[in-house]
Amino acid sequence: MPEKPTEDARFYGRRKGKPLRATRQRLLDTMLPALTLPLAGLGEGERLDPRGLFPRPVDQLWLEIGFGGGEHLVAQAAAHPEVGLIGSEVFAYGVGKALSQIDETGVDNIRLWPEDVRQVLPALPDGCLQRLFVLFPDPWPKRRHARRRMIQPARLDDFARLLADGGELRVASDDMGYVRWTLMHVTAHPAFRWTAQGPTDWRERPADWVETRYEAKALQAGRKPAYLIFRRRPRAADPGTLAEAPAGEGADNNP
């Protein structure tokens, strides 16, 4: 059984870095308020209605946690105008960069949360997501920092609640320790199935997977990322069957 570290409720990571350009600061001041999720207006126990977040009806709702500079988020929004995307990122520089791309491309199917994503997850209704992305998160490589990693048993419970049956959890990392951690915890969770059938399924970027800035840096440094796709099992499935179902590819092909 994978270890279950107690989750650290505090936030760790940078919120601010080098000073923002004047144009990006202007976007933070003027554009961000209109795109920010309206969590402040929710009562206790109340949840957002995804249908009311976007200017037109959307067929699916996707969430990206820690979108970095927004390359993947904005590219997916442009490629899938029928999908509503929510992006969460606490680093002000990344939020400003994403706003610049949103402004340049004119996409209108993105909503943002520039704070801790743990404030968003309880406000979303059950089964509302068809895809959930955790791409190149901080690996927190030291053992004593394991509680700070995004992939945790309690967080996977949140993801399982939010993903619709058959929905996808997509995780990417160039840190093999984090990849093994992810596989250990996600495949141990009864709600998820790893979709890989062979090593090429996780060693090669899927065709619809947009390269991020962090991924490009990893490749330039000679680090080979892993691309993991997990599928949300049907809620109506027999629990005994879930426990016995294969997690994905054979052990010989694992990272």
Swiss-Prot record:
EC number: 2.1.1.33
Catalytic residue positions: 138
Disulfide bonds: none
Binding-site residues, S-adenosyl-L-methionine: 64, 89, 116, 138
Binding site for substrate: 142, 174, 212-215
Keywords: Methyltransferase, S-adenosyl-L-methionine, Transferase, tRNA processing
Catalytic activity: guanosine(46) in tRNA + S-adenosyl-L-methionine = N(7)-methylguanosine(46) in tRNA + S-adenosyl-L-homocysteine
Gene Ontology CC annotations of this record: tRNA methyltransferase complex
Example GO molecular function: tRNA (guanine(46)-N7)-methyltransferase activity
Gene3D superfamilies registered for this protein in UniProt: Vaccinia Virus protein VP39
Record bears the keyword tRNA processing: yes
Recorded metabolic or biological pathway in which this protein acts: tRNA modification; N(7)-methylguanine-tRNA biosynthesis
Keyword RNA-binding among record annotations: no
A Pfam family recorded for this sequence: Methyltransf_4
Function recorded in the entry: Catalyzes the formation of N(7)-methylguanine at position 46 (m7G46) in tRNA.
Family indicated by similarity: Belongs to the class I-like SAM-binding methyltransferase superfamily. TrmB family.
Record PANTHER family: 3-DEOXY-D-MANNO-OCTULOSONIC-ACID TRANSFERASE/TRNA GUANINE-N 7 - -METHYLTRANSFERASE, PENTACOTRIPEPTIDE-REPEAT REGION OF PRORP DOMAIN-CONTAINING PROTEIN
Protein name: tRNA (guanine-N(7)-)-methyltransferase
